[in-house]
Amino acid sequence: MTGALIGLARVCLTAAPTAYTHRIVLEGLFTTITNVNFNEETMHVIIDKVNAEKAALLSGKSVNGSLPSSTETDRAAANYEVQKIWQADEDIRSLKSLILFGMRGMAAYAYHALMLGRSDQSVDDFFLKGLRTLGEDLTMEELLPVVLETGTVNLTCMELLDRANTTAYGTPVPTTVPLTIEKGPFIVVTGHDLKDLELLLKQTEGKGVNIYTHGEMLPAHGYPELKKYKHLKGNFGTAWQNQQKEFANVPGAFLFTTNCLMPVRPSYADRVFTTEVVSYPELVHIDDNKDFTPVIEKALELGGYTEDHVMTGINGGNTVMTGFAHGTVLGVADKVIDAVKAGAIKHFFLVGGCDGARPGRNYYTEFVKQSPADTVILTLACGKYRFNDLDIGSIGGLPRIMDMGQCNDAYSAIKVAVALSEAFGCGVNDLPLTLVLSWYEQKAVCILLTLLALGLKNFYLGPTLPAFVSPNVLNYLVENFNIHPTSTPEADLKAILG
């Protein structure tokens, strides 16, 4: 897939890309993110689309995905041998990996924005530039600027998606979300695609089927145009890595709109549906016409629980909160600033990122539990499930844990940090703010690169550092951006707060 995309990007140097060209680039990159597509057949279909578009551009016209008869035989023609990236010098491989993985994560954001009618030419152009960069023989000195440019463009991309989401669904508002599943038929929607959730809410209205979010879909409850649907009831379960246990024998249907899909177990395989770029062998896939009838019928057939089914977060809490995006937090900025000046708030932590199954991720639970009562925890992405059901109190009427949204809502955290720095007349790195990030997949890469591109320093990353980063590149990041590997909550809190 990556080799075909690099080949297409090279063609775009001599043939003007079309809107469809840009879309197929997004689709191809998005498809290769961890836990999106397990289906070799559909991967080849997308590769064929990429090669068809390449052939069409070379012939002077785009065919919008129609496959010329020679596509199968031409599949490898002019495509880059991607193994050259993995066989390169480890420092070159590391930097190209940062660019590639960063673009994959960014493509997910751009794809979601496109589904809501938003795109940005500078973002589209960078994907082609970045892909061509992967296929070129460049030095570390030549690659480093492109690594940081990936982060800069991702900030534009996150802003684009934020604008798309808030234009379509309103500015998120603080919302308490129950974790109990009410009796009766229900569908659990997971992933990140708010448009798919909206379409499902419309199609299930008045049909006696309740809708629950899962994983990164939790922040949907904060958007006014989604929360107005009375049958959007609550949130099911915890983070993605627990799905094989949490989904087993559940009498409801599951819809995956994006990652993270794990290998499906027999105990629930008959009730899992995919859509968009998500694909898994033998599962029913909802195509672009978005007729969710099979999902709805399965939910009605299963019938749901006969009595309300109590579920909790990993710490035993039965509700969580969301909706503290930049619009909400900046709306009470005067209260926050006054609380800082009065000494009621001594420090802010942004604790979030990707969750995973690796031992040691309880670090983030303990970090939040042990954080002093005069500190505020901003959080985002699925890493929040390690602690978002905790009740650690409030400061000045504001909860100490504020969920800012999905991973792409790192944009909200950046907006808040910049606004606070302006209010206090200092740089962002001089704020009483520390980032404590959990690491897993490609979306974490593009967010990390954005933080680096903005010049943010002195943050903590764990529970392990990226395995694909070479010692030399890691040393560069540590020396230039003062990135700390997490150690223990006690030691890190002491180092941060003194």
Task: Give the label of every model feature segment.
Residues 1-24, 31, 63-67, 94, ...:
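Anaerobic metallocofactor- and corrinoid-dependent redox/one-carbon enzyme cores
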Residues 3-171:
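Electropositive, gly/pro-rich neighborhoods at or near active sites that engage anionic ligands
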